[in-house]
UniProtKB/Swiss-Prot annotation:
Family matches, as PANTHER family: THIAMINE-PHOSPHATE PYROPHOSPHORYLASE, THIAMINE-PHOSPHATE SYNTHASE
Pathway where this protein functions: Cofactor biosynthesis; thiamine diphosphate biosynthesis; thiamine phosphate from 4-amino-2-methyl-5-diphosphomethylpyrimidine and 4-methyl-5-(2-phosphoethyl)-thiazole: step 1/1
Disulfide bonds: none
InterPro entries: Aldolase_TIM (IPR013785), ThiamineP_synth_sf (IPR036206), ThiamineP_synth_TenI (IPR022998), TMP_synthase (IPR034291)
Protein purpose: Condenses 4-methyl-5-(beta-hydroxyethyl)thiazole monophosphate (THZ-P) and 2-methyl-4-amino-5-hydroxymethyl pyrimidine pyrophosphate (HMP-PP) to form thiamine monophosphate (TMP).
Enzyme class label: transferase
Protein name: Thiamine-phosphate synthase
Amino acid sequence: MREPLDPLGPALAQASLYLCTDARRERGDLAEFADAALAGGVDLIQLRDKGSAGERRFGPLEAREELAALEILAEAARRHGALLAVNDRADIALAAGADVLHLGQDDLPLPVARRIIGPSPLIGRSTHDSAQVAAAVAEEVDYFCVGPCWPTPTKPGREAPGLGLVREVASRATEKPWFAIGGIDEARLPEVLDAGARRIVVVRAITAADDPKAAARRLKDALVSR
């Protein structure tokens, strides 16, 4: 396992609430939203605009627009001591000075991504079955995500392995940080915690909330109480 460089390693180890958000182009409130969610206790914030309402209305987020949105998130993350993550794009992560690059199963090979972003940023991996989990535990990624726990509109057509995979990963007792992901909200969180997860990734549980700060705070309180 790669030893993360300080101060990112300790920040990741202590993180429990990871938020993926789109650029909120149809609302125009990214700065206000990010500040509220981070004030509520979000530890990592990732920009992921694929399949968003903004993409459907305005088209795919171009690199210049993505970097502008990431600068907004970076400023908010710095104010709140949180980590900034970029999805898929190692070049964008490098240009944005992101703390974290998150890779899916079909993204750049890990060694290539590492050469692009350099030694300091953290790299995470998505996993959807036992074999992918085993690979993520063995390879030099800094954390991995497990799921989806439930089907989710942000990943249409993807079969959800459910909480069974979460239980399996929890039974491994790996020291590498991992997050349960997929359809998790405040109502479902107790089931996820009962399955053995202690870190989660959420989307709509905060992005669709009337009060993002309060929604994040309730999730964080439930996580730290275990």
